[in-house]
């Protein structure tokens, strides 16, 4: 029986292992992008809630003589939003901050509609367009 040539076996094994390592590395980067996006959205929702409390809560609101639906404006300017969460504005994306009334609470929601996971085929579409909220009792 003729002995087979072993040249190139190490390079082939490295290619197989390197593909798995690079896939795991890029998956970790993707999860990191998602985590920093959600954290930035939380910071933006919290800042929007603070701005709303400073600008909207007055004697009538504290005395509950007005409806919470009168305080649903966005009190942050685009420049302030970008200063609070600059990562959200990468690649031309723009986060949205909305305030809605749920019962007797105001809910400030921050979302990033254009965000896409790099490995969406691996994670699915449930992680695209993340959103987070902050509730304020009124």
Regions found by a protein language model. Name each.
Residues 1-7:
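N-terminal leader/signal peptides at the extreme start of proteins
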Residues 10-30:
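Alpha-helical hydrophobic helix detector
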Residues 11, 15, 45-52:
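Small-residue (primarily alanine) positions within well-ordered alpha-helices
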Residues 16, 33-36, 56:
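Short coil/turn residues that cap or connect secondary-structure elements
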Residues 30-42:
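Membrane-proximal amphipathic alpha-helices
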Residues 38, 47-138:
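Short, conserved structural patches
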């Amino acid at each position: 029986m003729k002995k087979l040539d072993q040249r190139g076996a190490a390079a082939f094994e490295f290619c197989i292992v390197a593909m798995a390592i690079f896939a795991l590395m890029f998956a970790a980067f993707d999860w990191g992008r998602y985590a920093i996006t959600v954290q930035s959205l939380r910071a933006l929702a919290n800042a929007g809630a603070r701005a709303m409390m400073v600008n909207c809560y007055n004697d009538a609101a504290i005395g509950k003589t007005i409806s919470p639906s009168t305080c649903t404006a966005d009190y942050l300017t685009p420049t302030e939003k970008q200063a609070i969460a600059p990562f959200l504005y990468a690649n031309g994306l723009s986060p949205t901050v909305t305030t809605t009334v749920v019962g007797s609470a105001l809910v400030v929601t921050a979302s990033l509609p254009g965000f896409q996971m790099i490995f969406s085929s691996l994670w699915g579409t449930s992680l695209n367009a993340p959103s987070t909220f902050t509730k304020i009792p009124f």
